[in-house]
């Protein structure tokens, strides 16, 4: 029976006899004495087998190799002063092995080095194919432990301090497509009919509020068939919450308590409260996006009113057609950003054009407020307009002003992208800093140009601001997102709980009443039986843990993730299935593999 985990042994355990299990991380032979680094999920401890002091274990120690699985019984001893290792928590002690029992060996060559003391860069596809080995590595083991600690902290706060109940909602449900594509599951018992895997528990958690559950949470598995990127997976996990009889302010404050509890529990950090807040409109104005990284400045400045009547048509036409002209001021930019980088072929030019801009206009502020700029600006802006630009941006000698002009969306996207790139390149972003803020008052709807209709910016169950009910098309939503260092980690809203308002929202996004009742009739009927006011929020667990772990991809905080092609390299899923299975489901595939010529 195991008495201790490897990484838990300390000087206070000296003279104890312990039983350990684990993997051989490294084996070294120094002058006839064998040293073994024994590893389990908690860390490493040094094992010593000496032919003089521990003759019974020595023959077995000689046979050990990396990643052999062993049981070791031995006595905890103080390390000699010259071999103390302050780099590991167990560095004051070592175990003299009385016995070593080999439980299992390694019969094939390891695809990569696992030892935490011999760092090796391994291609991600190899790591994913041998994920069970990758997860033995110290970094990955710590990421999984951090994930567990975050979930544990969530549960303790919600259950012990806020009286939430954990309730499971169905995984097999009906398809109500709104946004990403559903994963569909054919029903054998009901031929021709299909389940969908849930994109979120949204409707069920609202029904739980109708049921009087009052405060619900769930560590929920969700599924979306969408194009993937570094922070997306086809199946992902979220902390899902819903609360009755709470105002938006009360929900935000409760969630600030939750987030602060998580940081204190897993990082021992005290996060100041209340968190800063920005409306959606203000975030777009100052940063060009609704999830700004506020660890650094470089705020955008709207100068549309100054240049709307200028002779420079790029500026004046942008404003006349309903667009914007904004400036990204870069203090000291004359020294750090060359013209080569701004002009075609340069990295900043490329960043801007990839975001939709046609190019970058600029002004360099020289001594005595003299301006170095492109001819079109120099010749077509009056002296007063130039001085107004300097005054509004606060620019001084040595500063660089980068312009975005055009439709508002493109200007915001391009300058927001440049802001992040320049902020990182100039070392303005402190990686140790933690900035959390709420974004509030989102628009209810956005225009879908492909389908030529309005669609819900969040989802169609979000409650509109009561002040805006007379004109839903331009209404603000009672919605809120939590942004952590420029990454959205949570989002929620107050919900519609009145049938007539829900019907109006469905109509606004182009759903006929027949279609609305076909898809959501069960929800609309529930609203006729005394539905309480309610609201909620969901946190992307994978994304939150990724940030807390300092990783760049959520794949590094998920035990068995999919690739960006939505495949599992370990199990080779997805895969074809037996024709018999398809016949039982009365499903036929029309897919034909492409020929080489195609």
Curated annotation (Swiss-Prot):
<dbReference type="InterPro" id="IPR047090">
    <property type="entry name" value="AspRS_core"/>
</dbReference>
<dbReference type="InterPro" id="IPR029351">
    <property type="entry name" value="GAD_dom"/>
</dbReference>
<dbReference type="InterPro" id="IPR004365">
    <property type="entry name" value="NA-bd_OB_tRNA"/>
</dbReference>
<keyword id="KW-0030">Aminoacyl-tRNA synthetase</keyword>
<dbReference type="InterPro" id="IPR045864">
    <property type="entry name" value="aa-tRNA-synth_II/BPL/LPL"/>
</dbReference>
<feature type="region of interest" description="Aspartate">
    <location>
        <begin position="202"/>
        <end position="205"/>
    </location>
</feature>
<dbReference type="InterPro" id="IPR047089">
    <property type="entry name" value="Asp-tRNA-ligase_1_N"/>
</dbReference>
<feature type="binding site">
    <location>
        <begin position="540"/>
        <end position="543"/>
    </location>
    <ligand>
        <name>ATP</name>
    </ligand>
</feature>
<keyword id="KW-0963">Cytoplasm</keyword>
<dbReference type="GO" id="GO:0006422">
    <property type="term" value="P:aspartyl-tRNA aminoacylation"/>
</dbReference>
<protein>
    <recommendedName>
        <fullName>Aspartate--tRNA(Asp/Asn) ligase</fullName>
        <ecNumber>6.1.1.23</ecNumber>
    </recommendedName>
</protein>
<feature type="binding site">
    <location>
        <position position="233"/>
    </location>
    <ligand>
        <name>ATP</name>
    </ligand>
</feature>
<feature type="binding site">
    <location>
        <begin position="224"/>
        <end position="226"/>
    </location>
    <ligand>
        <name>ATP</name>
    </ligand>
</feature>
<dbReference type="Pfam" id="PF00152">
    <property type="entry name" value="tRNA-synt_2"/>
</dbReference>
<feature type="binding site">
    <location>
        <position position="458"/>
    </location>
    <ligand>
        <name>L-aspartate</name>
    </ligand>
</feature>
<feature type="binding site">
    <location>
        <position position="495"/>
    </location>
    <ligand>
        <name>L-aspartate</name>
    </ligand>
</feature>
<dbReference type="InterPro" id="IPR012340">
    <property type="entry name" value="NA-bd_OB-fold"/>
</dbReference>
<keyword id="KW-0436">Ligase</keyword>
<feature type="binding site">
    <location>
        <position position="224"/>
    </location>
    <ligand>
        <name>L-aspartate</name>
    </ligand>
</feature>
<dbReference type="InterPro" id="IPR002312">
    <property type="entry name" value="Asp/Asn-tRNA-synth_IIb"/>
</dbReference>
<feature type="binding site">
    <location>
        <position position="488"/>
    </location>
    <ligand>
        <name>ATP</name>
    </ligand>
</feature>
<dbReference type="GO" id="GO:0003676">
    <property type="term" value="F:nucleic acid binding"/>
</dbReference>
<keyword id="KW-0648">Protein biosynthesis</keyword>
<dbReference type="GO" id="GO:0005524">
    <property type="term" value="F:ATP binding"/>
</dbReference>
<dbReference type="GO" id="GO:0005737">
    <property type="term" value="C:cytoplasm"/>
</dbReference>
<dbReference type="Pfam" id="PF02938">
    <property type="entry name" value="GAD"/>
</dbReference>
<dbReference type="InterPro" id="IPR004364">
    <property type="entry name" value="Aa-tRNA-synt_II"/>
</dbReference>
<feature type="binding site">
    <location>
        <position position="178"/>
    </location>
    <ligand>
        <name>L-aspartate</name>
    </ligand>
</feature>
<comment type="function">
    <text>Aspartyl-tRNA synthetase with relaxed tRNA specificity since it is able to aspartylate not only its cognate tRNA(Asp) but also tRNA(Asn). Reaction proceeds in two steps: L-aspartate is first activated by ATP to form Asp-AMP and then transferred to the acceptor end of tRNA(Asp/Asn).</text>
</comment>
<dbReference type="GO" id="GO:0050560">
    <property type="term" value="F:aspartate-tRNA(Asn) ligase activity"/>
</dbReference>
<keyword id="KW-0067">ATP-binding</keyword>
<dbReference type="InterPro" id="IPR004115">
    <property type="entry name" value="GAD-like_sf"/>
</dbReference>
<dbReference type="InterPro" id="IPR004524">
    <property type="entry name" value="Asp-tRNA-ligase_1"/>
</dbReference>
<dbReference type="GO" id="GO:0004815">
    <property type="term" value="F:aspartate-tRNA ligase activity"/>
</dbReference>
<dbReference type="Pfam" id="PF01336">
    <property type="entry name" value="tRNA_anti-codon"/>
</dbReference>
<feature type="site" description="Important for tRNA non-discrimination">
    <location>
        <position position="30"/>
    </location>
</feature>
<comment type="similarity">
    <text>Belongs to the class-II aminoacyl-tRNA synthetase family. Type 1 subfamily.</text>
</comment>
<comment type="subunit">
    <text>Homodimer.</text>
</comment>
<keyword id="KW-0547">Nucleotide-binding</keyword>
<dbReference type="InterPro" id="IPR006195">
    <property type="entry name" value="aa-tRNA-synth_II"/>
</dbReference>
């Amino acid at each position: 029976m195991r008495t201790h985990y490897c990484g838990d042994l300390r000087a206070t355990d000296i003279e104890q006899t312990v039983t350990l299990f684990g993997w051989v991380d490294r084996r070294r032979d120094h002058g006839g004495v064998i040293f073994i680094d024994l590893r389990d999920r908690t860390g490493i401890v040094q094992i010593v087998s000496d032919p003089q002091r521990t003759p019974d274990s020595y023959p077995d120690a000689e046979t050990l190799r990396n990643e052999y699985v062993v049981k070791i019984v031995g006595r905890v001893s103080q390390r000699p002063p010259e071999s103390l290792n302050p780099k590991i928590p167990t560095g004051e002690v070592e175990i003299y092995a009385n016995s070593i029992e080999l439980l299992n060996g390694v019969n094939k060559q390891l695809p990569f080095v696992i030892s935490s003391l011999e760092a090796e860069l391994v291609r991600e596809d190899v790591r994913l194919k041998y994920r069970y080995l990758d997860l033995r590595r110290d970094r990955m083991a710590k990421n999984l432990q951090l994930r567990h600690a975050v979930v544990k902290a969530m549960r303790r706060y919600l259950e012990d301090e806020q009286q939430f109940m954990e309730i499971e909602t169905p995984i097999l449900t009906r398809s109500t497509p709104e946004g990403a594509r559903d994963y569909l599951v054919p029903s054998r018992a009901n031929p021709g009919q299909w389940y969908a895997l849930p994109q979120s528990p949204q409707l069920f958690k609202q029904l739980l509020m109708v049921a009087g559950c009052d405060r619900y949470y769930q560590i929920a598995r969700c599924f979306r068939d969408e194009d993937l990127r570094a922070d997306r997976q086809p199946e992902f996990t979220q902390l899902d919450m819903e609360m009755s009889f709470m105002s938006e302010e009360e929900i935000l404050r409760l969630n600030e308590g939750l987030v602060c509890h998580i940081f204190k529990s897993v990082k021992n950090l005290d996060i100041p409260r209340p968190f800063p807040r920005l409306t959606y409109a203000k975030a777009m104005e100052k940063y060009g996006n609704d999830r700004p990284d506020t660890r650094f400045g470089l705020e955008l400045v709207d100068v549309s009113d100054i240049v709307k009547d200028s002779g420079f048509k790029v500026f004046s036409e942008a404003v006349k057609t309903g667009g914007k002209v904004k400036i990204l001021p870069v203090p000291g930019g004359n020294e750090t950003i060359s013209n080569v980088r701004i002009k075609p072929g340069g990295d900043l030019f490329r960043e801007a054009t990839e975001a939709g801009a046609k190019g970058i206009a600029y002004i360099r502020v020289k001594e005595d407020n003299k301006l170095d700029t492109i001819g079109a600006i120099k010749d077509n802006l009056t002296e007063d307009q130039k001085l107004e630009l300097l005054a509004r941006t606060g620019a001084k000698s040595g500063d660089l002003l980068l312009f975005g002009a055009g439709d508002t969306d493109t200007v915001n996207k391009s300058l927001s992208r440049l802001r992040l790139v320049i902020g990182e390149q100039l070392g303005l972003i402190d990686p140790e800093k933690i900035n959390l803020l709420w974004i509030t008052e989102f628009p209810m709807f956005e225009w879908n140009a492909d389908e030529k209709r309005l669609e819900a910016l969040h989802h169609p169950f979000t409650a509109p601001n009561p002040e805006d009910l007379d004109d839903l098309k331009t209404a603000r939503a009672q919605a809120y997102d939590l942004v952590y260092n420029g990454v959205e980690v949570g989002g929620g809203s107050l919900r519609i709980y009145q049938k007539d308002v829900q019907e109006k929202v469905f109509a606004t996004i182009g759903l006929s009443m027949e279609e609305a009742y076909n898809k959501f009739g069960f929800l609309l009927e529930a609203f006729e039986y005394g539905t309480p006011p309610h609201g909620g929020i969901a946190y992307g667990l994978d994304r939150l843990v990724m940030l807390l772990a300092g990783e760049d991809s959520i794949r590094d905080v998920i035990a068995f993730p999919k690739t960006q092609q939505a495949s599992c390299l370990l199990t080779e899923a997805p895969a074809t299935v037996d024709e018999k299975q398809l016949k039982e489901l009365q499903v036929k595939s029309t897919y034909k593999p492409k020929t080489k010529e195609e």
